[in-house]
């Protein structure tokens, strides 16, 4: 098993933000939104009523934009710790004409200022692998979720060996530039395994059945707070 090698917590240069935004995340983002909406629908129809969603680690806001373009009947508070990402996110939100539906905020998701039980749903795509102590983020995301709400977190899954990692880079970033390939490689090294996520869920009192491997490179938590 590959050891976890941490990468920088914040991608806060203009080059990183622009390179990240230019990578083709469209298929992954569509699947994320499909699955998030399904999770809300399964939770007593949350996806069909106005609600406020918190997006942790929004990056350049591609997923909130995809969500709102599906005519989602709610709003999104989209957060990131990187100012450079939020600059690009603001441009993307304005270009999509979604300023009234998506609020961009600077947040450290390890220490959120929000009160307990603030949001109807919390979603996050690929923030966990950036965090040295991922339980800190997952604890906060669970805390700000209302009872009855849905926590939906998806992230990269660390492969078992270097050959598998190299295969994933070739498969999913083979046509990317050198910097983009480097970012993807480092993210895979920094990612958690499903068993490591389950250990954290036990500590937080969240069902371990809520996390599953959902692709050859992703795990997903889908949990309803009682």
Segments predicted by a language model, with ranges:
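Class I SAM-dependent methyltransferase SAM/SAH-binding core
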Residues: 54-56, 61-111
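Conserved beta-strand signature within the Rossmann-like core of class I S-adenosyl-L-methionine
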Residues: 149-155
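N-terminal, positively charged/glycine-rich alpha-helical extensions of SAM-dependent methyltransferases
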Residues: 1-21
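A short acidic, Gly/Pro-enriched loop at the edge of an enzyme's catalytic core
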Residues: 110-121
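A short glycine-rich, Lys/Arg-flanked "PGG" loop and its adjoining helix->strand segment in the class I
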Residues: 136-147
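A short SAM/SAH-binding and catalytic strip from SAM-dependent methyltransferases
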Residues: 121-133
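Conserved alpha-helix/loop element of class I SAM-dependent methyltransferases that forms part
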Residues: 26-49
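C-terminal alpha-helical "lid/dimerization" subdomain adjacent to the S-adenosyl-L-methionine
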Residues: 156-204, 209-213, 218-219
């Amino acid at each position: 098993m590959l050891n976890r090698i941490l990468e920088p917590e914040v991608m806060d240069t203009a080059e990183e933000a622009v390179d990240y935004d230019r990578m083709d995340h469209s298929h992954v983002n569509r699947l994320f939104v499909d699955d998030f909406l399904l999770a809300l629908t399964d939770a007593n129809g949350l996806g069909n009523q106005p609600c406020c969603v918190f997006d942790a680690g929004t990056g350049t806001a591609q997923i909130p934009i995809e969500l709102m373009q599906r005519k989602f009947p709610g709003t999104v508070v989209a957060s990131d710790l990187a100012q450079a990402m939020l600059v690009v996110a603001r441009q993307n939100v304005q270009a999509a004409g979604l300023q009234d539906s998506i609020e961009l905020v600077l947040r450290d998701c390890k220490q959120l200022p929000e009160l307990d039980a603030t949001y109807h749903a919390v979603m996050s795509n690929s923030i966990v692998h950036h965090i040295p102590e991922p339980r800190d983020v997952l604890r906060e995301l669970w805390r700000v979720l209302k009872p009855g709400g849905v926590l939906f977190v998806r992230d990269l899954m660390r492969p078992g060996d270097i050959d598998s990692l190299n295969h994933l880079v070739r498969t999913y970033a083979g046509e990317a530039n050198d910097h983009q390939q480097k970012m993807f490689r480092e993210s895979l090294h920094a990612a958690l395994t499903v068993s490591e996520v389950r250990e954290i869920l036990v500590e937080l009192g969240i069902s371990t059945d809520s996390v599953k491997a959902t692709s050859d490179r992703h795990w997903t938590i889908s949990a309803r707070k009682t």
